[in-house]
Curated annotation (Swiss-Prot):
Protein name per Swiss-Prot or TrEMBL: Ribosome biogenesis protein Nop10
SUPFAM superfamilies: Nop10-like SnoRNP (SSF144210)
NCBIfam families: PRK13130.1 (NF009623)
Keyword Signal attributed: no
GO terms for cellular component: ribonucleoprotein complex
Pfam family, one: Nop10p
Protein's gene: nop10
Cited function: Involved in ribosome biogenesis; more specifically in 18S rRNA pseudouridylation and in cleavage of pre-rRNA.
Keywords in alphabetical order: Ribonucleoprotein, Ribosome biogenesis, rRNA processing
Lineage of the organism: Archaea, Methanobacteriati, Thermoplasmatota, Thermoplasmata, Thermoplasmatales
Organism from which the protein derives: Thermoplasma acidophilum (strain ATCC 25905 / DSM 1728 / JCM 9062 / NBRC 15155 / AMRC-C165)
Length: 62
């Protein structure tokens, strides 16, 4: 399995380890998902960005 660069959310350090060597917190993969022009989940990502899924922008406009 190939290794991807990881980032610590607490101290913002980049590493290849599962745990941050500086502060010991869990790290996450810092590489964004691959872009595809045929994106099956595009609709849901756009709705989430606009707040329509969570009910924040449910059509009650003034």
């Amino acid at each position: 399995m190939k290794s991807l660069i990881r980032k610590c959310p607490r101290c913002h350090a980049y590493t290849m380890e599962e745990k941050c060597p500086k502060c010991g917190s869990d790290t996450y993969i810092a590489v964004p998902p691959r872009y595809s022009p045929v994106d099956r989940f595009r609709k849901y990502r756009i709705e989430e960005l606009r707040g329509e899924i969570d009910g924040e922008n449910s059509g009650d406009q003034i």
